[in-house]
Amino acid sequence: MASIKTALLEIVKKVIKWDKKLEIYTNGEDNAYPERMERLKNNSITAKMASNIMTQYLIGKGFGELDNVKIGGVKLIDLTEDIARDIVDNDGCFIHVNFDANFDISDWSVLPFNNCRIGQKDSKEYNGKILVCNDWNDIKKNPVRTLNVFNPAKEIVMYQVGVTEN
């Protein structure tokens, strides 16, 4: 007769605090909360199925005929699935918007939530930067990119890329 083993895992509460060295708000006490949750989910059939069901619930029936419309080379339904997956698994998502030379939106993509952290607040308590790194546990080997938070105003975008001064 086979024995069944169970294990109870203590899941540490997600703590967000300011890291002066990295100049980011950490995602968990050790800044690895999303990666830890992803590992736990992937090692549990039930958690993985629940994540898939919730993602499909958020997507619903999609956009009908518009499912195959491409935005920046990516199908709308695939973009929607990436957004829904990050919302279900991480309670948030990061969308990167690109502008063309006329400062009009040219395309957009979903950045992996695990790779993104929110930057420092400015004097008006506004988080204007998102920092992106492929491996926050080894930032010496993985460069950190800084992205501006989306703003649809052309004059702000021009200022962010250094075309005009404030």
Which residues does each PLM region occupy?
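Structured, contiguous alpha/beta core segments that scaffold functional sites
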Residues: 1-166
